[in-house]
Amino acid sequence: MHIHPVGTRALLVELDGLSQVMAWHEALTAQPLKDQVDAIAAATTLLLTFNTPNSAHAAAEFLKDFHPSARSVEEPRLVEIDVLYDGEDVDEAASLLGMSREGLIDWHTSTEWLAAFGGFAPGFTYCTPADASRGVDIPRRSTPRTAVPAGAVGIAGNFSAVYPRVSPGGWQLLGTTTTPMWESDAQPPALVQPGDRVRYRAVSSLPDIVSTTPFGRRTPARLPRMEVIDPGLVTLFQDQGRPGRGNLGVTPSGAADQAAAATANVAVGNPRGATVLENIGGIRLRALTDTVICVTGAQARVLLDEMPVHLARPVLVTAGSTVIVEPATYGMRSYIAIRGGIVADTELGSASTDVLSGLGPAPVRIGDIIGVLPRSSAMTDAQLTNPLRVSEGSHGQTSGVLRCVLGPRDDWFTQDSLDAFLERKWEVTPQSNRVGLRLTAASAAEAPLQRAREGELPSEGMVAGSVQVPPSGEPVVFLRDHAVTGGYPVIATVLEEDIDIAAQLPPGATVRFELVEG
């Protein structure tokens, strides 16, 4: 057993195998440690996240002598999944395993599978043969698909799983099922839970899909306040997200710049975690009734009926007035809070839109009516400052510094690459989004980061701030909508306090990493 720090608020516990991972996960889920937020199991590791650095440090000391009690002896639940074996990769997978097509299907259906852990996407559960002697090791596709259909049944390595919704993927596809793997309103929402037994049954046809909407959403009551005239490039509903659901494959999500969102809410008298609008590229709103708003985040001009107003200040907007937030001069995301607290459809208790999984409400559109909760609010606060922590460079581009702790997989890289990672100026590429910042060296003459070892890393838990390095050697800084698990080594982890900085770095921005003590 080895414990790796992950930033300052998480630990990656490396264990001897899947059975030990499942035992630890069961024990620490049943009896969480102090301030423990999440426990994310993977093939050989368990990621534990905490609310504070002190709690993570205390947990690391406690776990050095931790021995989970015997696992539950309850009869496992059996989940049966009907599969039409019409997958695009059946023949290729059979060839890779030295089987016939019929032999592969027989192996897949006659094997009893153990649900080991969730990850990748809501409802995606990694299953391994309950009898280890029936295991195989099949490689992923050399070129992943950009879109795997919902209900696709795949295998990779020693695992089998069902894709619950359309998503990218590199597994070998054997067939299709219409069995819904995820229903947000169900308890539990994922059909297959860790510890369950799974059997696949070959069928000649499948029933129609009952619902084309894989995720259920609840619509609370609301009072109309603003009409969207122009949502800009993209405007999303965001709040504090869905922490603590990583075992379901659900990432925390939430406002990309949480300090800016909280400041806007406090300014208008809302709770810090109330829902706000998160905007890129400017937005134009019309007031339907008298209300109070506040804009924070990126440096941008805000106009009320063509008169400029200050960022981070509560502003009275009378019925019929127009509010314009112009595109940012530097920074990236603007946040708009409305007194009372914006109301949007909720899923798993949150109105946050997760762009990777598809959880949460759709992006805001022209003509949408923005409503608020029918409740009283606290006093407004006009003494706040905008918490933007990026700066404007000499050529007008945004720049920032991200504090980080090396690891947990810094030993996968050469010393020269570790030095280069910290010394270089990196540039944010246009392929960046709420999932992560994709970086490239600001100087074309600089070589990609190099690994010190061969092979691939088994998928393991990720956090916002994980800096993955794919085979290209160009880092990716995970943001709020990151995948729950990932398979590339993490060279460093950005401090939780600096994720807000990363969220305000647009394409073309430059960034440096600054090493701090863990």
Regions inferred by a protein language model and the residue ranges of each:
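Conserved "landmark" site that anchors the functional core of diverse proteins
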Residues: 1-518
